[in-house]
Swiss-Prot record:
<comment type="subunit">
    <text>Monomer.</text>
</comment>
<dbReference type="GO" id="GO:0005525">
    <property type="term" value="F:GTP binding"/>
</dbReference>
<dbReference type="GO" id="GO:0005829">
    <property type="term" value="C:cytosol"/>
</dbReference>
<dbReference type="InterPro" id="IPR004161">
    <property type="entry name" value="EFTu-like_2"/>
</dbReference>
<dbReference type="InterPro" id="IPR041709">
    <property type="entry name" value="EF-Tu_GTP-bd"/>
</dbReference>
<dbReference type="Pfam" id="PF03144">
    <property type="entry name" value="GTP_EFTU_D2"/>
</dbReference>
<dbReference type="InterPro" id="IPR050055">
    <property type="entry name" value="EF-Tu_GTPase"/>
</dbReference>
<dbReference type="Pfam" id="PF03143">
    <property type="entry name" value="GTP_EFTU_D3"/>
</dbReference>
<feature type="binding site">
    <location>
        <begin position="81"/>
        <end position="85"/>
    </location>
    <ligand>
        <name>GTP</name>
    </ligand>
</feature>
<dbReference type="Pfam" id="PF00009">
    <property type="entry name" value="GTP_EFTU"/>
</dbReference>
<dbReference type="GO" id="GO:0003746">
    <property type="term" value="F:translation elongation factor activity"/>
</dbReference>
<dbReference type="InterPro" id="IPR031157">
    <property type="entry name" value="G_TR_CS"/>
</dbReference>
<keyword id="KW-0251">Elongation factor</keyword>
<dbReference type="InterPro" id="IPR009001">
    <property type="entry name" value="Transl_elong_EF1A/Init_IF2_C"/>
</dbReference>
<dbReference type="InterPro" id="IPR004160">
    <property type="entry name" value="Transl_elong_EFTu/EF1A_C"/>
</dbReference>
<feature type="binding site">
    <location>
        <position position="26"/>
    </location>
    <ligand>
        <name>Mg(2+)</name>
    </ligand>
</feature>
<feature type="region of interest" description="G2">
    <location>
        <begin position="60"/>
        <end position="64"/>
    </location>
</feature>
Length: 395
């Protein structure tokens, strides 16, 4: 009996494989597509197809990423796999692939390694809510006690970084065995996907969050008033809704939406993802400028001080050729505009080299609307020298 064709009615989640180099992330990705394609849920992708990751540009940074999609009985997944460690760091920090959950791959032969730890920490910093563990290469370890020890070590590490190490699923298997259709290991791949289905939660969709639209442009329509255009980032906006306009150092403005224009038609509502023009009552064109945001009243506040997890580009990536020191003052490109900010380095860090990834303190010269998870590029003279996201608002 043929399985039904792909349908969009299943909930969609973004996940990815993370973990130390050579622990089997790409092999596992290939095994998942193989086992699920045998069940009729997707097309299988070979190791080489996944490993040969195309280059992508995200916020001015080149990243190699492979995208694979597959379905389980309950969900549709978009899965990212990166060939190199630097690609993972860049991917997670820039949010090129926003992950709703991750599969942490740890080889039973090695146990947790430095990049295992680093990826868990990054996941915590960039807000990956939950992780499922796949202990790989279990077929190469014949000591049950050793397997138990490795599992305990992984659970402790997850707990250390504030994940639920005690209750999170750990599946012991062999990615290569699953890929090669070995009857001992195929069920473990199925078990892993069931664990993803049950443990990784569906994210709150953008349309369910409060309304927010960054302003890209402003103009006047004679007889109608002021229109601000942009792409609605989150939420839904209806005609008649009260809104606030904040950011760029200006006093908070309040207004009412008198219409929403899309494709040269006036509509009653706009939602996340729409490019729209919002007609605002009683607001002069001079009062709004690019870089401000229009929001549901009270949902976001402007802030100027925050902590952030950042990746600084290497020279070969078009970044700086030299390190920078404390009190470095680049521009922070947030949503639609540049704001100058001052970077304070962590205690004990003298300078930051191109290619580094670290946590910094930033003070912007003018406050902008922000919440934890907000992404930005760091620019200098119009070129991107780094990227990051807000991990904590300090003032």
């Amino acid at each position: 009996m043929a399985k039904e064709t792909f349908n969009r009615s299943k909930p969609h989640l973004n996940i990815g494989t993370i973990g130390h180099v050579d622990h089997g992330k790409t092999t596992l990705t290939a095994a998942i597509t193989k086992v699920l394609s045998d069940a009729g849920y997707c097309q299988a992708k070979s190791f080489d197809q996944i490993d040969n990751a195309p280059e992508e540009k995200e916020r001015g940074i080149t990243i190699n990423t492979s995208h694979v999609e597959y379905e389980t009985a309950n969900r549709h997944y978009a899965h990212v796999d990166c060939p190199g460690h630097a690609d993972y760091v860049k991917n997670m920090v820039t949010g090129a692939a926003q992950m709703d959950g991750a599969i942490l791959v740890v080889a039973a032969t090695d146990g947790p390694m430095p990049q295992t730890r680093e990826h868990i920490l990054l996941g915590r910093q960039v807000g990956i809510p939950r992780m499922v563990v796949f202990m790989n290469k279990v077929d190469m370890v014949d000591d049950e006690e050793l397997l138990e020890l490795v599992e305990m070590e992984i659970r402790d590490l997850l707990s250390f970084y504030e994940y639920d190490g005690d209750n999170g699923p750990v599946v012991q298997g062999s990615a290569l065995g699953g890929l090669n259709n070995d009857p001992a290991w195929v069920p473990k791949i199925i078990e892993l996907m069931e664990a993803c289905d049950s443990w990784i939660q569906e994210p709150i969709r953008d349309t369910e969050k409060p309304f927010l639209m960054p302003v890209e442009d402003v103009f006047t329509i004679t007889g109608r008033g002021t229109v601000a255009t942009g792409r609605i980032e989150t939420g839904i906006c209806n005609t008649g809704d009260p809104v606030e306009i904040i950011g760029m150092g200006a006093e908070k403005l309040t207004s009412t939406v008198t219409g929403i224009e899309m494709f040269r038609q006036i509509l009653d509502r706009g939602e996340a993802g729409d490019n729209a023009g919002i007609l605002l009552r009683g607001v002069a064109k001079e009062d709004i400028k690019r870089g401000m945001v229009i929001i549901k009243p009270g949902s976001v506040k402007p802030h100027a001080k925050f902590k952030a997890e950042v990746y600084i580009l290497k020279k070969e990536e078009g970044g700086r050729h030299t390190p920078f020191h404390n009190n470095y003052r680049p521009q922070f490109y947030v949503r639609t505009t540049d704001v100058t900010g001052v970077i304070m380095l962590p205690t004990g860090v003298e300078m930051v080299m191109p290619g580094d990834n670290l946590t910094i303190d930033v003070t912007l010269l003018s406050p902008i609307a922000m919440s934890v998870g907000l992404r930005f590029a760091i620019r200098e003279g119009g070129r991107t020298v780094g990227a990051g996201q807000v991990t904590e608002i300090t003032e």
